[in-house]
Amino acid sequence: MKILIWHVHGSWTTAFVQGRHEYLLPVTPGRDGDGLGRARTWDWPASAREVTPAQLREEEQPDVVVLQRRRDLELCREWLGREPGRDLPAVFLEHNAPGLEPGDGPVPHTRHPIADRDDIPIAHVTHFNELFYDNGRAPTTVIEHGIVDPGERWTGELARAAVVTNEPVRRGRTVGADLLPGLAAAAPLDVFGMGLTGLHEQYGLDPARVTLFDDPPQHAMHAELARRRLYVHPVRWTSLGLSLLEAMHLGMPVVALATTEVVEAVPAEAGVVSTRPERLWAAVREFLHDEDAARLAGKAARAAALERYGLNRFLRDWDALLEEVTR
């Protein structure tokens, strides 16, 4: 089938477009939020095609739309002249934990933006999110993440910790940016992601202790992550980070805050999960000094990630949902 989906979350979409369908990715002249088109830093197959609004109106009518934002509803009406859920089958893919968008309201009373509709199912990416949103009348399901397996590549040759985070200066405490000084005191630290400019200054980080890798291509980031001794996930409040699951696939041991879905994703043998930063920093130091323990934890992390977050299961789950809504 032809699936209309906007390029909103590159890592998630990388897994989604590995399926057997045609994926129509809107592109606008400015490649803005209404139409980013194909990814520049991820490898997507030819079945993921860029389409203009005019093409969508005239020749590329989709069979189903995967909505990810309120704005997508408006664009379907404007570009296609069709109403999602009524004359265009639709699923609303909710990437976020509640309370992160303007107007969301306080958790756990955050009402989902389509909570008053019963004609569009909400697909949450974690059971935590499904539980904490007020979904109202909307039917819900959970399709957990799937990862394109980068392979078991961990060497741990560099006695350093790795963190992947996007826009930590803007997002601050939400992604645990304020915890980085404590982490950097426990281990030399490499931070990968987008929007890292100003991170040293904002949190008083020593450039000799903390190195930034701003927006590397995914394949290059995986290669660099695998050389670090361990992966640290200091995030307070987001959905389950795909970078965490990718690190587990690489075979990296994990040290993570026990928040949102992390406690379900990271088994005890894969590393250390706690709400106590001092316990996490102690675990970081232990892995730096015990490479064998890091290797064993990394193997357990990879096994757990493959079992629960494999690509084939993810694609099967999405096929089943899309077939249901297009019946």
Identify what each model region corresponds to.
Residues H222, L245-H249, T260-E264:
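Short alpha-helical segment that forms part of, or immediately flanks, the ligand-binding pocket
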Residues P253-A256:
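Short hydrophobic beta-strand element within catalytic cores of glycosyltransferases
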